[in-house]
From Swiss-Prot:
The active site is at E68. Keywords: Cytoplasm, Metal-binding, Zinc. The keyword Transferase does not apply. It comes from Glaesserella parasuis serovar 5 (strain SH0165) (Haemophilus parasuis). This is Protein SprT. The gene is sprT. Disulfide bonds: none annotated. Belongs to the SprT family. The lineage of its organism: Bacteria, Pseudomonadati, Pseudomonadota, Gammaproteobacteria, Pasteurellales. It is found in: Cytoplasm. PANTHER family: PROTEIN SPRT. NCBIfam families: PRK04860.1.
Amino acid sequence: MQVQRQLKRDLDKANRYFNKHFTPPTVSYTVRGRKAGVAYLQQNEIRLNPILLSENSSNFVQQVVPHELAHLLVYQQFGQVQPHGKEWKMMMKEVLGVPAETYHCFDVTNVAGQQFPYRCGCQTHFLSIRRHNAIMQHKRSYICKKCKEILVLKVK
């Protein structure tokens, strides 16, 4: 319910600002992992992470919902532009009245997937299961940005 109320408030702001009627998006709760939310522009849909929402309800609703809605509003108003470009920043600040933040700071302990330790010449890196599997299947290799060495699975 909080999500729908926030969406309505923000849509009302955008409708008044642009003097037009934006189509309300559909909302689903199917995002997994560390992402808080995703906007699907052509489908006019916002997908949210239900675990992060339940663990951070008011902050999540006040930050993530306007963030994703701003992507949809920008697409409807300006077409295809940079995801966090000047139009999106303007939509966040001027229209919706919220800071134009591109990353959330929620605790992702309960949603983070399994991590695999890899080493290089200077440090240990933790890779996702997707990257780990790509390495194991000889489809990909990853290089440390600092020392430029190929990452190797750290044997315990």
